[in-house]
Amino acid sequence: MDFLLEALTNWLKEMLVGGIMSNLSGMFDSVNQQVADISVQVGQTPQGWNGSIFNMIENLSNSIMVPIAGVILAIVMTVDLIQMIADKNNLHDVDTWMIFKCVFKSAAAILIVTNTWNIVMGVFDMAQSVVAQAAGIINSDASIDISSVMTDLEPRLMEMDLGPLFGLWFQSLFIGITMWALYICIFIVIYGRMIEIYLVTSVAPVPMAAMMGKEWGGMGQNYLRSLLALGFQAFLIIVCVAIYAVLVQNIALEDDIIMAIWSCVGYTVLLCFTLFKTGSLAKSVFQAH
């Protein structure tokens, strides 16, 4: 009877240990790949990230938004002229400089609208240059490596009782599901930012048309601040990855495999949280809303 019980116990142990090793091996591969891809993704300009989407957005902006921006520009300049006349006692106190001012503002506004795409792309080119310089300075490996604490893991697991092994198996299963969820979160942040950039740039001529307006000028100024926030969000993301890289390098020093794995999960959750915060932080820095 004892022989059967011992055989059953060993069989359960082998099954649980095999399941634990299977859950742990390659658990962080997808997250490591996504984290390594962050620097590549955020360091690209809208044109370099996806040329097909870029060309489509450029065509939509030039063919649809620019004519609408022209109408808005005419309205804004007309309203400004009417206000200028009303402020000067219905032309009784008018000076010649008012005419030159109106002509200059109109010419500047037309120049801005016709070169909106170049201005917008210039903002992201500048941000890409900053990110490239930051990535060159940081140059840290952010991959999670727990192979050093898994070398003698299987013999240590076989020495454990069934109860702790069941608990460890459930933990490894839960951690595996958690890491996939974190992989999806990182994907959403990085790709969501690029989609937001394309959406914002597609309507660029409309807010830029109001840039020179007295009453409507705040629309264009806030739009420029939003562009700067989106561009420099990439720099904040690079800093987050650099901090994450420093933290995960200490994981290999852990002797306890469970502590090492939960540390990996904790650091990755922290990375996801900070990545989600980079957008609002960048907007608060540039006072964009």
Put a short name on every predicted segment:
Residues P67-V79, I197:
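Hydrophobic alpha-helical transmembrane segments
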